[in-house]
Amino acid sequence: MEKKQFVISVYTENHVGLLNRIAIIFSRRKINIENLNTFPSGSEGIHRFIICIRETEEAVQKLVKQIEKQVEVLQASYSI
């Protein structure tokens, strides 16, 4: 499968250490984060992460499922 550019969007509760746990999910799979932005969403106490990577769609699907397993993660999705 061909690697493509993907954008992963993650909505989370604002908790200390969550960014580190999400980054570990990427590093265990040897996936490089090309771009990462985090900012408050429109709801109080909720933050949004925008993560850009270059990977196969199959790997991204598995990655998003793993991110969603984190307790503080409310929603994770990806797009091309």
Regions found by a protein language model. Give the residues of each.
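A conserved regulatory-domain signal marking ACT and ACT-like small-molecule sensing domains
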Residues: 1-80
